């Protein structure tokens, strides 16, 4: 596969397609945009001229799966906290 060039060029050229990919997984445009932006922000300091499109698609997919997992864990923790704080019914 051909390298995608520098981060700015790659983002302009492939950002919309990467957001669509993320949106299909997350079912939220806002979250998809956040995931793609975060990916590029994290990649910029260690960008390599060898970065290609399949790498970016795989990275976005992995970020989305991590996002879903983290949201699931967060929801579970909130449920536990709510159960611990909720007043218990008194039995007479």
Task: Cite the ranges covered by each PLM segment.
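Arg/Lys-rich amphipathic alpha helix in sigma70-family domain 2
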Residues: 51-53, 58-80, 87-89
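A short, charge-rich alpha-helical start-of-domain segment used by transcription regulators
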Residues: 1-20, 30-33, 44, 48-53
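Solvent-exposed, flexible loop/coil residues
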Residues: 30, 81-82
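Short amphipathic alpha-helical interface segments enriched in basic and hydrophobic/aromatic residues
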Residues: 12, 19-23, 27, 40-48, ...
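Amphipathic alpha-helical segment used for protein-protein interaction
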Residues: 2, 13, 83-92
């Amino acid at each position: 596969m051909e390298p995608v060039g520098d981060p700015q060029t790659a983002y302009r050229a492939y950002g919309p397609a990467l957001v669509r990919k993320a949106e299909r997984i997350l079912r939220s445009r806002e979250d998809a945009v956040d995931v793609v932006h975060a990916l590029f922000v994290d990649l910029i300091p260690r960008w390599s001229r060898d970065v290609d499109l399949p790498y970016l698609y795989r990275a976005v997919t992995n970020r989305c799966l991590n996002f879903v997992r983290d949201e699931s864990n967060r929801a579970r923790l909130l449920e536990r906290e709510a159960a611990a704080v909720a007043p218990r019914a008194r039995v007479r």
